[in-house]
Amino acid sequence: MKANCFSRTPVATLVIMAIFSTPVIAADKKSQVINNFQVMTVTAPTSSPLTIISSPKTPRQPVPASDGSDYLKTIPGFSQIRNGGTNGDPVFRGMFGSRLRILTNNSEMLGACPSRMDAPSSYISPESFDLLTLTKGPQTVLWGPGNSAGTVRFEQERPYFEHADIKGTASALAASNDRWDVNADISMGNQLGYLRLTGNKSHANDYKDGDGHPVPSKWSKWNTDIALGWTPDEYTLLELTAGKGDGEARYAGRGMDGSQFKRDSLGLRIEKSNIGEVFDKFEANIYYNYADHVMDNYSLRSPSQMMGGHSGGHSTGHITGHMPMVSAKHSGHSMSMKMPMAMELDRKTVGGRMMGSWIWSDFELQSGADMQINTHRSKRNNQWNKDARFQDYGIFSELTWKATEQSSLISGARVDRVLVNKYASMNSAERTDTLPAGFIRFEHTLAEKPIMLYAGIGYTERFPDYWELFSPTYGPGGTHNVFNAVKSEKTRQLDIGAQYSGKQINGWISAYIGQVDNFILFRYDAHNARISQVDNINATIMGGEMGMSYQITDTWKTDASLAYAWGENTSDHHALPQMPPLETRLTLGWQKDKWSSTGLLRLVSRQGRIAINQGNVVGKDFDSSAGYAVFSANAAYQLNDYIKLSSGVDNLFDKTYSEHLNLAGNSGFGYSSEQPINELGRTFWAKLNVTF
């Protein structure tokens, strides 16, 4: 008999932990569009289908893990490649990796693992931030180069104080599989400045799938951050930030687990607004992010004789233990991992950005420059060895012309200079490139109807990232010189969309079609999954997202969303790999006074358009996938202006299913070489949110 129940946490403890752990919702216009009352099940655009803005603090269903990727999954168009219980890799519109830039407070945190065991999103604790903003496609140039799929920004807003005060929010979550999360975000200050403290801790044991089988997936994480701000007036800000974090995670789909995810962060930002009649605002920030990652096969599991599936590391990392050092890339699919082994790698990322805003007549210009330097190292014989350094220097401008009351024309351009060094004892090398990007978009709101329309075309070039240059065994044409052979991607994409905002009905649609030259593709050896070849092909992509909400009565409301992504390898005339299937979400919600309740039905079709043994540095297509339907439900009660209690059950009918984007389970846990990792079975959860 299957059983899934809460860890037995007394309600009093839950309340006390929530009250002494808390976040700040600052008084910004963007915050006002976020509705924190209900549990979020479908994320819809607020003003344009091109941009999604939501609050990471709002309870979500299905209840996400503690990392950024699982939160992004609640937005139509997003999916993830599952490793275990946490630290999945986000995918938007079928696009993966550095095609999707993920920023926190205008800084980038890059992981160290050559196979992305510690993806950038794994270092993000979403509830520490006030806003989550997604810009789809290459329709902005403000946030770095090569963002062909989109740009995701997690932001903390400046807390405002009219007098000496303390305020914040807190949350505590208890769920099946001994899940227990606490989050704190507290600000104190006055008109001249503030101190903001954020912290969180998250823990879960292995979950069970719908058949009651345990899936190796336990994790434990913590993060803490501090921000000290000086605000001599309402138009001036000088803020210093610092943060640390660590954790561990067990992975069903890898030959090693993550036993360390150390994070160190420093930042400084300056903002000055309302400067003059034309020069309106200046903002600048610099940051330092450091990731120190350890993976091993003994901290969270017992070393087994054979470890198939993803090894968790490649030749850029070095295995240490009671056996000679082995390069996982050349070790073969039947590499013996009976002996305890570990790999330690790190990455230091330093960057900065400055931008000015000018407003005159019907024009607004945003122009500036940014830069980033990141260095990757691996540890061998207790000594750090540098293997790669990436440098990027860019300038950018965006111009908005309010042509009429209903029409706007937005355009932008940027150019980046990239320098990459490969450090090796025998064949060190250097590459440089210049990357142009630009877009133009027309937006129009009908005069007599609540309909907004837009169409934009964008172009961007993306230099190969660390994982595409240093992780593969071979390069295009089978060359061993991967570093010099992989070309930069070039994406041309048309984005169109519309939004209708009525009294009872709201609807939106965003669609795209694009051509990608030199699309970077991984091909895996059919007999040895650790041997890979990276190649450049040409591809066509298209798809979109759409949604609708209908206010049936004052208390009843229904929402629906649909997302679809399609890709074709036009060089080889077959499907592009790692494309998520058609997905639909249907919700029916009820709200009256302080009570609310929602039912969510998630429908996913089968995916038969696959490219066997092709994919990216993390995942590959190894089989078609079946469709499924999963039903979840929740209820929430607003006790007063300060306390909200929500609870729910995910996968109510205990469905056994797996996502199409998936890692094959690891043989050390009893999985076959092409057996996907199943999703969570029935999961109960309860969450307490406190605001003061």
Residue ranges and their predicted role:
Residues 33-71, 89, 225:
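N-terminal periplasmic "start-of-domain" segments of outer-membrane beta-barrel proteins
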Residues 59-62, 66-72, 88-91, 103, ...:
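N-terminal periplasmic accessory domains that precede
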Residues 108-136:
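Short acidic/polar hinge/loop motifs at secondary-structure boundaries
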Residues 153-155, 160-163, 169, 180, ...:
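Periplasmic-side early beta-strands and strand-to-turn transitions of outer-membrane beta-barrels
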Residues 204, 217-219, 235-282, 289-309, ...:
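Flexible loop and strand-edge segments within Gram-negative outer membrane beta-barrel domains
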Residues 225, 334-356, 392-396, 483-487, ...:
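Outer membrane beta-barrel strand-and-loop segments of large Gram-negative receptors
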Residues 246-248, 290-292, 375, 417-426, ...:
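Surface-exposed extracellular loop regions of Gram-negative outer-membrane beta-barrel proteins
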Residues 402-409, 511-516, 534-614, 653:
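Gram-negative outer-membrane beta-barrel transporters
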